[in-house]
Amino acid sequence: MSAKHVLISGVVQGVGYRAWLRSRAEALGLSGWVRNRLDGRVEALIAGDIAAVEELIRACRTGPSAARVDRIEEHLDTDPITPGFEQYPTV
């Protein structure tokens, strides 16, 4: 089990990025959450099988077709994770 906190920068809001990420995470059997930030980035916590977590982070480098990802910051996370994947409001 692995958990990573990621911040995604670029043209990532208003392009369906959160819904895309949630759908991909659920398809991979991952848990966590995703939300927009007021600073224009998308933030996510992704947890599950390490290979699936890394696969999703690789996919996040491209994102949905309307997105343009400039940068992804990722850090290991050790907080307890609730099963399932949620899409939260902007913070």
Swiss-Prot record:
PROSITE patterns: ACYLPHOSPHATASE_2, ACYLPHOSPHATASE_3. Keywords: Hydrolase. It catalyses: an acyl phosphate + H2O = a carboxylate + phosphate + H(+). Its EC number is 3.6.1.7. Gene3D superfamilies: 3.30.70.100. One of its GO terms (molecular function) is acylphosphatase activity. InterPro entries: Acylphosphatase (IPR020456), Acylphosphatase-like_dom (IPR001792), Acylphosphatase-like_dom_sf (IPR036046), Acylphosphatase_CS (IPR017968). The keyword Hydrolase applies. Residues 3-89 form the Acylphosphatase-like domain. It holds the Pfam family Acylphosphatase. The active site is at R18, N36. Belongs to the acylphosphatase family. This is Acylphosphatase. It comes from Granulibacter bethesdensis (strain ATCC BAA-1260 / CGDNIH1). The lineage of its organism: Bacteria, Pseudomonadati, Pseudomonadota, Alphaproteobacteria, Acetobacterales.
